[in-house]
């Protein structure tokens, strides 16, 4: 018996949605057999990998419609960094009852990967482990989570339109246009930017400075700022995420603390030579025109991890950024609400201070809002943040 969950997901070009609602989600082989004209989203390397993997009965993955348990995955990220815009894509939600079909197959990762096992329903001993990827928010190559988060339900030939429960798109304007394109059929079209690695909201304060509510580690900024202490411990908050997802950053952080290169009021810039896009996208190392480097700015907001954050040290660090960003080659910058949340400082104090300094930068800057509690709208206004 399969545990219940809400939906599975199919990633497609938004122009294909009307046809999908009429004919269903077809396997690529079935699309070719029926000579259906559709907009393809996958490049040749992805196509060849899926065509070439054969099952024991000699069927190719090309004969199956593939549904993901978690659509916010490396494959979707790849499509977006290859040049497709969020508005070009739709995520088709499929009722979990498709799993009751006896002819489906389940994979424990990206089906095209040689490391992935493909199971019949009767062969699976613990489906919960596979389905748990629906709760994953990020991934790494080293521990296999990058492959596992792309676990699939493979449906032979076609997913009947009756199984389709909703369509997710990137914003309200796209949703409105799609509703018209499908003649306002009785199916929900839901704008959800987080599915497409977009922030929940963005508030533009100046030409270069914005407030963002979302996951900073999916920012396309060249330099990501991480709040740290000066004793080399990454235990909670964003720092603990960095320690797990980017262990090389943690090693550099500890070394900088030991050598006193990172001090209170003086951030340390780690000019990492690898691309976050390559790290996050499926087969990202083979893609061209990526963000070539993702740097990390280690910004001390407290002296010891046991202490609360100190506003004076934060101001000194902001001053360092203003004085050094050009010389260091920082081209764009993402910064969390320094010292807020676990640091114990209030946005009403930190926000205006950060904006006072960061408005001086002649580069794109995103301030990521604290998620621990909702900030009153009045404290997010240009008047409050820029005129204080």
Swiss-Prot record:
- Provide the active-site residues from the annotation: 50, 152
Entry keyword annotation includes Cell division: no
User: Which PROSITE patterns does the UniProt record give?
Assistant: DART, MACRO
Catalysed reaction equations from the record: an N-(ADP-alpha-D-ribosyl)-thymidine in DNA + H2O = a thymidine in DNA + ADP-D-ribose; a thymidine in DNA + NAD(+) = an N-(ADP-alpha-D-ribosyl)-thymidine in DNA + nicotinamide + H(+)
Concerning InterPro entries, the annotation shows: ADP-ribose_metab_enzymes, DarT, Macro_dom, Macro_dom-like
What does this protein do, in the record's words? Answer: A fusion protein of the toxic and antitoxin components of a hybrid type II/IV toxin-antitoxin (TA) system. The N-terminal domain ADP-ribosylates ssDNA on a thymidine residue, while the C-terminal domain removes the modification, neutralizing the toxic effect.
Q: What is known of its domains?
A: The NAD(+)-binding element stabilizes the ADP-ribosylating turn-turn (ARTT) loop which confers substrate specificity; both domains contribute to ssDNA-binding.
Q: What is this protein called?
A: DNA ADP-ribosyl transferase-DNA ADP-ribosyl glycohydrolase fusion protein
Instruction: Give the source species.
Output: Thermosipho africanus (strain H17ap60334)
